[in-house]
Amino acid sequence: MSASANTNPLLDFSGLPRFGEIRPEHVTPALDTLLDAASRAVETASAQETPSTWAAVVETVEQATEPLGRAWGIVGHLNAVADTPELRAAYGENLPRVTEFWSSVGQNLALYEKYKAIAASAEYATLSAERKKILDNALRDFRLSGAELPEEQKPRFAELQEQQAALSKAFSDHVLDATNAYAYVVEDEAELAGLPGDAIEAAREAAQKDGKAGWKFTLHFPSYFPVLQYAENRALRETLYRAYATRASELGPQYGGGKAEWDNTAIVADELKLRREEAQMLGYRNFAEVSLAPKMAESPQQVIAFLEDLATRARPHADKDWDELRTFAAKELGLAELAPWDVAYAAEKLRQQRYAFSENEVKQYFPEPAALKGLFTVTETLFGVRIKPDEAPVWHKDVRFFRVENRDGSLVAQFYLDLYAREGKRGGAWMDDARSRAKRGSDVQTPVAYLTCNFSAPIGGKPACFTHDEVITLFHEFGHGLHHMLTRVDELGVSGINGVEWDAVELPSQFMENFCWEWDVLSSMSSHVDTGAALPRELFDKMIAAKNFQSGLGTLRQIVFSMFDMLLHVDFDPAGATGVTAFAREINERYHVIPQAAFSRWPNTFSHIFAGGYAAGYYSYKWAEVLSADAYAAFEEAAAQSGSVLDAATGTRYRREILEVGGSRPAMDSFKAFRGREPEIDALLRHNGMAAPAH
C-alpha cells in the first residue's frame, strides 16, 4: 500500500491525514485498494484451512479493515465539514460499496463460525477481558447483521442495509440543501429592532458577501435563532419560523423557497418500512428491539417506562412554566395567544425581566481564547494531563490542532478543533474519531479526535464570543473527546468510545457540562471581550437562578422527541392511515403542554434518527443524563470536603473507572466501579430544579 501512498494521500497511514492534499478524485482509487485488501483478509480469515485463533482470524481482519475505516472516516468527515459537489458525488458513489462490504462481513457465515470456534476453544479462557469483550460483541453483531439468516434471505438483507444507507444520505443532503437554499434579506434597519449588535453585524456581512445591501438571514442556527429569540418584529419571526419548521417537507417550497425534491416525507416512510422488515427478518418483534440489543436498556418497555416516569415528574413543572409564560406574554407583551414563533421571544423577555440579564450580556465574557483556556484548565486539573498547541495539515484555515500529554511529557492523544459555522459544513456539534488507540507490537497508536462545532465566527477583528450555551456545547463535545483520547485500552475494538453502549456514550459528554455551572470554573475562565473583566458574581448568581428557567418545558420537549422515536419503532405502521407528521402531533399532544404548529414538519429534519444512528435511541440522552448527573454528584460530595468540584482525587478515579476503560467492560460495571452503586435519578431531578418536594 505504501507505494501508492505517495500518489494517493488517502492511502498514507504513517501519520496524520494529509488534508491539504486530499482531492475528491483520490476517493475511488483509495477505496479500490482498501476494499480489495480488506476483502482478501476476510477471505483468508474465513478459509477452512485457517486455524480458529485470535491471531489468524480477528487480527487478520482488524489489520485490514482498520485502514479502510480510517480512510473512509476522513472522506465522511470532509463530506460533513467541507462539502463540495465533487466530494459529495465521490462520497455518494462509494457509500454503497463500503456499506456492501460491511454487510458482507456481517453476514459471512464462515467468518461467524470462526469467531464461534474461538469463543468455544481453550484459547478463549486465556484471552484478556478486552479480547473476550470484542469476541462477545462480534458474535452479537454477526447475529444482528443477519449471519444466521438462511442463505436465500441474505441478498435481501444486504439490500436493506444499502437502501437504508442511501436513504440516510439523501435525508441528510435534503436537510442541508433546504437549509442552505433559504435567505431572507431585510432592507429596512427598523425591522431589526431588538436584535443584538453582533447578529445584525453578521447579517450585514452575509449580505455584503453576496454583493447586496441590507441584512441577510439564513436558516443556519447562529443566524436563525437570534431572530426567534430577540426580534421585536413579529412578522420577521414568523417568516423565519415557517421556513425553518417546513424545511425538507412538501411545504418547504411554499415557506422556505426550497425544491419539491428535497421533501423527506417519503424517505422517512421508506426508512421505517425497511427497518421494520429488517427486524422481522432477524426474528424481532420490532426495530426498537434490534436497536436496544447492544444497548444498556434491556427492552423498549423499560425505556418507555423510564420516559413516562420522567414525564410524570416533569409535567407539573411544565404546566407551571407554560402558565407563567402565557400570563406574562398577555400582560407584558400584548400577545393574547402565543404562536410558536413567539415562544422563544417571550421566554427571553420573561427571563430578562425576572433575572435582569440577557444571553448576549453573558456572551461578552466568553471570548474564545478565555473559554478554551478554561476548558483546558478543568481538564488538566481533573485528569492530570497537559494540552498544548500542535501542528498538522487541516481542511480549513480556521481549524486548529492540539496535543494532550501526560505530566511527564509523553503523548496521550491529539485533536482537531473546528469551531465555526460556514457554507458547506453540516450544522450541529459532534466529536468523531480520526484514529483510535491500539497496540501494534510494542508500539502504541495514539488516538486522534475531530471536535466540530458551529459557532458564530469572529467579526470586526475581535475574537469570537460564545454564549453560555455554546460554552456548554464546547465542554460537551470535549467530554466525548476525552472518552476517546484518555483511553488506556490497547485493543482497537473496545478502546475509547468503540464498543461503548450507545445509551452510555453521552455520559462523559453530559458530565462535562456540569462544570459550566460552577462559580470557580466560570469566574476563572471569563474575560470580557473589551475590558478583560471577569464575570461578575452578581451576573453569575442570576445565571444560576435562571438555570432551570422553564426546565419543565425543556424536559417535556426532549421526552416528545424520545417517545416519538421509540414508539415510531415499536408499533407505528408506516403503511397505515396515520402519517408520521400526524403521529408526531399526537405524541406532542400527549406529552407536551405547548401546542405544535399545524404546518410544522419537524420529523422531516430529525436527522438524529433518520440519518444519524439514533433510531430508537434518542432516549439515550436522558438515560445518560441520569448517569452523568449521578457521576457528577460524586464531585459535589468531594467538594463538600475539599472545597472545590475540581477535586483531583475524584477526577483520577473517574478517569480510571469511566474514561480509561472505554468499551472494555459493560457501562453499568464501570459506573458501579466509580460510584459504588447503581445509578439513581435524584441528581438529575435536583440539577434540573425538579427534585420532589420533601415529605
Q: Language-model segments: which ranges?
A:
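C-terminal, non-catalytic "cap/extension" segments appended to globular domains
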Residues: S2-P29, T33, A193-G194, K209, ...
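His/Asp/Glu-rich acidic catalytic environments and adjacent acidic regulatory segments
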Residues: A3-T33, A80, A89-E298, H317, ...
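Membrane-entry segments of alpha-helical transmembrane domains in multi-pass membrane proteins
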Residues: F19-L31, T53-V58, A260-N264, V303-L307, ...
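C-terminal non-catalytic alpha-helical accessory regions
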Residues: L35-T126, L556-H592, Q596, A615
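Membrane-interfacial loop-to-helix junctions in multi-pass inner-membrane proteins
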Residues: T53-A55, E86, Y91-G92, D263, ...
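Short, hydrophobic/amphipathic alpha-helical patches that form generic packing surfaces
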Residues: E66-H77, R140, R242, V343-K349, ...
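Active-site-proximal, well-structured secondary-structure segments within enzyme catalytic domains
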Residues: E130, I134, A166-K169, D173, ...
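Short pre-active-site segment immediately N-terminal to the catalytic Zn-binding motif
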Residues: S456-F475
